[in-house]
Amino acid sequence: MSSNAINLYIGNHNAASITDFIEFLSIEANDAGMRPIITHQLFQDTKNIVIECFNKDLNKNIKKLFSKHDPRLALVATEIVKDGMLNSTEPGKDEKQEGWYNTRSKYWLKRSKCFFDIVDYFGTIICVSEEIFYSIKALNLEANVIYWPPRFYGNLECFYENWRSKNIETLKSHEFLYSGSLTSYRMSQLETLLAAEVTLLSIKQDSPDVVRQRLSMQTGLTLGPKHYKNTRQLSKMRVLWCLNNMYPFVMERCSAATDLDNFCLFYDDVEELIDIAQDIGTVYPKSIENNHAFAMATKNLPSVLLPIL
């Protein structure tokens, strides 16, 4: 294989659910002078990027092909590690866990066990948020642990015209768009909105990107409630997708600060969403300026993949 090839391994995921990772990592690879390929295989003669989600068969294959702290393996860490578990949502002890992020479920117990079984084989670990970075660094692994700073990957040419054509000059069917796993905490917010006669469109979290794009254009704002009331970390990939695709959004404020906070529109309680829904257009001027400020601040950042060359 070409000496500057880099393999984006997707065999451990539903491809539709990681479209943003595939797109952004491909651009990062190109910007680092690499040629990305996307496969369901791991290769010994090139570098491989694996997005976290391990199982026994994948771990067995990695151990067969590679050695510990292997420079050919880079892991994209997508979850906070806490008390020996992958636990990004950090529900409070008094909260009922349900939906996708139930840390007591067999799925997360197995996924966490497989993570710790294989993490030492990676020479580089790329963390998609500050809180993930801090939690991985605390494990004192021999891998090179690096933070992936958010970037704008789009085109600044005709930025304002393109933003308006997507969000203002389009027919709106609903005020808010929501996609993601449902918990009692999230459901209580959605039910309050519906009771106030706010229109809400909900889609599956693994909907194809073309559907997500189309529905984002026909709704007023993408909605980002926390999983649980104690969830500490902003859903940064949701924010990054919206900023790069130039769609307005509103996120529930989390306690942990991030480098995206200055580019976000936040809410603290559902009553604020009801007020916003009365006239979605009033938040558009702030949304477009936030989006443009993000693009200007991050457009020329170096590729996160340069350290693994």
Over which residues does each language-model region extend?
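Nucleotide-sugar donor-binding catalytic core of glycosyltransferases
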Residues: S2-T46, E52-P71, L75-L265, A297
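Short amphipathic alpha-helix with an adjacent loop that forms part of the alpha/beta core around
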Residues: K63-L65, A277-I280
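Short amphipathic alpha-helical surface patches that serve as generic macromolecular interface elements
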Residues: K236-V239, V270, I274
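Conserved acidic donor-binding segment of nucleotide-sugar-dependent glycosyltransferases
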Residues: N262-E271, Q278-T282
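A charged, aromatic-enriched C-terminal amphipathic alpha-helix characteristic of glycosyltransferases
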Residues: E271, G281-L309
